[in-house]
Amino acid sequence: MSAAPLDPRGHGDPDVDGILARASFADDGLLPAVIQQHDTREVLMLGYMDREALRRTLTTGRVTFWSRSRSEYWRKGDTSGHGQYVRDAALDCDGDTVLVQVDQVGVACHTGTRTCFDADHLHPVTGARPAADEGPTP
């Protein structure tokens, strides 16, 4: 992972200014943050971070988001007790999305489900990988 990892006891030493310089925030100043359970790799939720929320996430060991609807910082679990504790973080190849691996306490979704992706399965047509001898499809 490209970001310096934080150890579970909060002893990470990330180059936060360097990470913020590499991050590519959108015109609205936000960066999508994919939140994933560190041990199962289950995707829990998607939130948004501005520079300060990313800084707080990398330096405190707790995930901090920017609320687009309330225009304020928030941390999962501050009211519910269902906290997200940072285990690792990485920017994607373009620097325009951050993956934060967490130790999730309780449920991640405000609806009371484990993830925010439990309710609305879209049932897409599934694809199949071509056989090894077929090569790529033109």
Curated annotation (Swiss-Prot):
General function of this protein: Catalyzes the hydrolysis of the adenine ring of phosphoribosyl-AMP.
EC class of the enzyme, as a word: hydrolase
Subunit comment: Homodimer.
Any Gene Ontology CC annotation: cytoplasm
Cofactor(s) in the UniProt record: Mg(2+); Zn(2+)
Main location: cytoplasm
EC number: 3.5.4.19
Membrane-spanning intervals of the chain: none
Pathway(s) where this gene product acts: Amino-acid biosynthesis; L-histidine biosynthesis; L-histidine from 5-phospho-alpha-D-ribose 1-diphosphate: step 3/9
A GO BP annotation: L-histidine biosynthetic process
UniProt keyword terms in alphabetical order: Amino-acid biosynthesis, Cytoplasm, Histidine biosynthesis, Hydrolase, Magnesium, Metal-binding, Zinc
Localization per record: Cytoplasm
Binding site for Mg(2+): 92, 94, 96
Cofactor binding remark: Binds 1 Mg(2+) ion per subunit.
Gene: hisI
InterPro entries: PRA-CH, PRib_AMP_CycHydrolase_dom, PRib_AMP_CycHydrolase_sf
Catalytic activity: 1-(5-phospho-beta-D-ribosyl)-5'-AMP + H2O = 1-(5-phospho-beta-D-ribosyl)-5-[(5-phospho-beta-D-ribosylamino)methylideneamino]imidazole-4-carboxamide
GO molecular function annotation: magnesium ion binding; phosphoribosyl-AMP cyclohydrolase activity; zinc ion binding
Binding site for Zn(2+): 93, 109, 116
Name of protein: Phosphoribosyl-AMP cyclohydrolase
Keyword Cytoplasm: yes
Family, per entry: Belongs to the PRA-CH family.
Entry-linked PANTHER family: HISTIDINE BIOSYNTHESIS BIFUNCTIONAL PROTEIN (PTHR42945), PHOSPHORIBOSYL-AMP CYCLOHYDROLASE (PTHR42945:SF11)
